[in-house]
From Swiss-Prot:
Binding site for Mg(2+): 13, 40
Record-listed GTP binding positions: 12-18, 40-42, 304, 330-332, 412-414
Taxonomic placement: Bacteria, Bacillati, Cyanobacteriota, Cyanophyceae, Synechococcales
PANTHER family assigned: ADENYLOSUCCINATE SYNTHETASE
Protein name: Adenylosuccinate synthetase
Function field: Plays an important role in the de novo pathway of purine nucleotide biosynthesis. Catalyzes the first committed step in the biosynthesis of AMP from IMP.
């Protein structure tokens, strides 16, 4: 038995959905522990493209229980759309469970999120506009609505009255937006609660029962390390903690329950929205990476910014998360390049540094110091074992492993499930990996 946390080692969009889907075959329980519909992952199954925002990837396996944990914020309207989409595709969702204490994204959260972002003008953070920040803000201010509140009309009417009055005041007086009606919201969200009620459980009890019965538990993070509220490129971050420590809080487990942590990183780097990005590329190579990598956000459809692999943020992710091994995705996107660069350090005001500045103002001034490596200029899409890879592709992977001081356990070479080289199964394999 092994309990594994899967995290993003960059700015999100690393391909965690595919890796989680792959590992879910060996997992009994998959737990989403933070974030909301601002995250998205795409899974390709039998030529079907499935895009999920809240439901864990493990839902595709009928013997796997999928739990949306207490640290996640839930937009029930979108969740129900995902459920309907899965049912329409013939997927059994009986294993889906939702924590009764997950907080709910309400309509005023979405409206406020968009209004606040528009009001920032040139100082935009790059929010998805899905209401995630305001939902977490209400949670912190002890003014939030939880899933359990949607199951009782009297309770919902009572708990929504004060936050709605406050939000209507903001909407009307500051942003000039028409106030929302309590009765309409209560009616709509009671209906959502009724439809979701059969999936609602006590999150902590469910996970600990599985652990007691020696089940394999997979904890699925959303976004990435550099978007972490406390450890990312603040203020250009999300409103929760995607790092591995967030799994303990968001799922309600102690750190001793976690056996290993796997980080997912692209063979290059991308970022959506605003904020510093030291290795960002411009021109033809940026366009090539974007086009070959289909770098458009699952949630927003926004074009992602592309750059070379950044070993400085990679080492930071290893440290902050305590990574045991790495999954490198989208290696195939680099297939046509004759030369590939990797950032090994930064130049900050004339000083060479190999650490990650958590101050965004300092990070903006950092200039990448690159190591040049030879490309392989042939397709890797059909490679299924390490020995199939071109020599220069192997050299590239070895360099990344040495730079980050963590072994590589999985290499992804395309969107399909079978386009993967599993060097070691992080759940059933020994606690080591073969590619260093």
């Amino acid at each position: 038995m092994a309990n594994v946390v899967v995290i993003g080692a960059q700015w999100g969009d690393e391909g965690k959905g595919k890796i989680t889907d792959l590992l879910s075959r060996s997992a009994d329980v998959v737990v989403r522990y933070q974030g909301g519909v601002n995250a998205g992952h795409t899974i390709v199954v039998d030529d079907k493209v499935l895009k999920l925002h809240l439901i864990p990837s493990g839902i595709l396996y009928k013997n796997t229980s999928c739990l949306i944990g207490s640290g996640t914020v839930v937009d029930p309207k979108i969740l129900l759309k995902e459920i309907d989409m899965l049912i329409d595709n013939g997927i059994d969702i009986s294993g889906l469970k939702i924590s009764s204490t997950s907080h709910v994204t309400m309509p005023y959260h979405r409206i406020l999120d968009e209004a606040m972002e528009a009001d920032r003008g040139s100082n935009k953070i790059g929010t998805t506009g899905r209401g995630i920040g305001p939902t977490y803000a209400d949670k912190s201010q002890r003014n939030g609505i939880r899933i359990r509140d949607l199951l009782n009309k009297e309770r919902l009417s009572d708990v929504i009255e004060i936050p709605l009055r406050e939000k209507n005041g903001l909407l009307e007086k500051i942003y000039g937006i028409k106030p929302l009606k309590l009765e309409d919201i209560v009616e709509e969200y009671l209906d959502y609660g009724e439809r979701l009620s059969k999936h609602v459980v006590d999150c902590t009890r469910t996970i600990h029962a599985a652990s007691k019965n020696k089940k394999n538990i997979l904890f699925e993070g959303a976004q990435g390390t550099l978007l972490d509220l406390d450890h990312g490129t603040y203020p250009f971050v999300t409103s929760s903690n995607p790092i591995s420590g967030g799994a303990c809080i968001g799922a309600g487990v102690g750190p001793t329950l976690i056996d290993r942590v796997i980080g997912v990183a692209k063979a290059y780097t991308t970022r959506v929205g605003e904020g510093p990005f030291p290795t960002e590329l411009q021109g033809s190579i940026n366009d090539q990476l974007c086009d070959r990598g289909s770098e458009f956000g699952t949630t927003t459809g926004r074009r992602r910014r592309c750059g070379w692999f950044d070993g400085v943020i990679g080492k930071y992710a290893v440290s902050v998360n305590g990574l045991d091994c790495l999954a490198v995705t989208k290696l195939d996107v680099l297939d046509e390049l004759d030369e590939i660069q990797v950032c090994i350090a930064y130049d900050l005001d004339g000083e060479k540094i190999d650490y990650f500045p958590t101050n965004s103002d300092e990070l903006k001034k950092c200039k990448p110091i690159f190591k040049k490596l030879k490309g392989w200029q042939c397709s890797t899409a059909d490679c299924r074992k390490l020995s199939d890879l071109p020599e220069n592709a192997m050299n590239y992977l070895r360099f990344l492993a040495e730079l980050m001081e963590v072994p590589i356990a999985i290499v992804s070479l395309g969107a399909n499930r079978d386009q993967t080289i599993v060097i070691e199964d992080p759940i059933h394999g020994p606690k080591r990996a073969l590619l260093r």
